[in-house]
């Protein structure tokens, strides 16, 4: 029994020392890495923190891109999409608080608060509507809230595998896992994970991958990311579950891989959402949740066709 106790205490001591050493190394590295970060875009002050806005292209119509949850660098994550669309449109990527080159924030992540910050950031950057909102996954909630609060600003909605409000009713709430992910990130355990864990855009060049990696170490999982994940089910109850008939919408829906739902369940949410809305077009794609990394050309083609016809 004494041997087992000593063995247990030895293992526990090793784990604690390992975590402490990792944390110290992580904090020192973050300070050094700050000098290597090369912000893309411009920063504006909103609610006491800097929000980063990236603009590409100068077309007559403006597409605002909103990323899904847990994306360390929305600018680099959507690089293929923004580059392609910027040849014809003005593409604006707004990095929410706690994402990319934006500051972290402990402000409320209520969906209306997040929308307000996005709206203020665009205004301060002198970017005016009407906007075509292109959003992924959880950003569906902000998109739907935008449609309700500022209807005259929304020309069209494009959903990249939207996590629709009804899906959050069935989403299993795992606060313990979120807390574990948060503290694992703060300690610096992400540094032991392979790049493929957090860099999904495999077309990035080496310098871009380095930037993405540094942003991942800094921002995953930020306070803002944690808080928005903790409040997402409540936020889903605050947005409308339909779209103004005057606003055309295109929903591109994945096969459910990468969500916690089966293909039938995931696509059924979109089917029900669009069932009585003639202005909502649904396209089903045989690709995972981050479908813009798997069928980029097809998605760009669909978006251009949709916008040309609307």
What residues fall within each predicted segment?
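Active-site loop/oxyanion-hole signature of alpha/beta-hydrolase fold enzymes
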Residues: 93-132
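Conserved serine/cysteine hydrolase catalytic core
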Residues: 205-276
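Short beta-strand immediately N-terminal to the catalytic nucleophile in serine-hydrolase-like folds
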Residues: 133-135, 160
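Flexible "cap/lid" loop of the alpha/beta hydrolase fold
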Residues: 158-186
């Amino acid at each position: 029994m004494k041997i087992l106790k000593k063995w247990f205490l030895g293992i526990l001591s090793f784990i604690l020392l390992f975590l402490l050493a990792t944390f110290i190394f992580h904090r020192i590295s973050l300070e050094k890495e700050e000098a290597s970060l090369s912000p893309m875009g411009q920063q504006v002050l909103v609610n006491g923190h800097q929000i980063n806005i990236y603009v590409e292209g100068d077309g007559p119509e403006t597409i605002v891109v909103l990323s899904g949850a847990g994306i360390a660098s929305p600018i680099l994550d959507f690089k293929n999409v923004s580059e392609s669309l910027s040849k014809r449109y003005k593409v604006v990527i707004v990095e929410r608080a706690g994402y990319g080159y934006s500051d972290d924030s402990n402000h409320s992540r209520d969906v209306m608060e997040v929308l307000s910050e996005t709206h203020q950031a665009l205004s301060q950057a002198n970017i005016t509507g009407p906007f075509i909102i292109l959003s992924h996954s959880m950003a569906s909630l902000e998109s739907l809230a935008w449609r309700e609060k500022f209807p005259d600003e929304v020309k069209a909605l494009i959903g990249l595998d939207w996590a629709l409000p009804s899906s959050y009713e069935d989403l299993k709430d795992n606060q313990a896992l979120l807390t574990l992910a948060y503290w694992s990130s703060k300690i610096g355990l992400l540094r032991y994970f392979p790049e493929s864990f957090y860099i999904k855009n495999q077309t990035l060049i080496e310098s871009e991958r380095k930037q993405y990696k540094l942003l991942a170490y800094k921002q995953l999982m930020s306070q803002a990311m944690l808080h928005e994940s903790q409040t997402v089910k409540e936020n889903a109850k605050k947005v409308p579950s339909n779209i103004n008939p005057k606003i055309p919408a295109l929903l591109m829906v994945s096969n459910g891989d990468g969500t916690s739902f089966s293909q039938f369940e995931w696509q059924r949410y979109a089917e029900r959402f669009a069932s009585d809305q003639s202005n909502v077009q649904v396209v089903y794609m045989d690709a995972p949740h981050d479908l813009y990394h798997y069928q980029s050309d097809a998605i760009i083609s669909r978006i251009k066709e949709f916008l040309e016809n609307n």
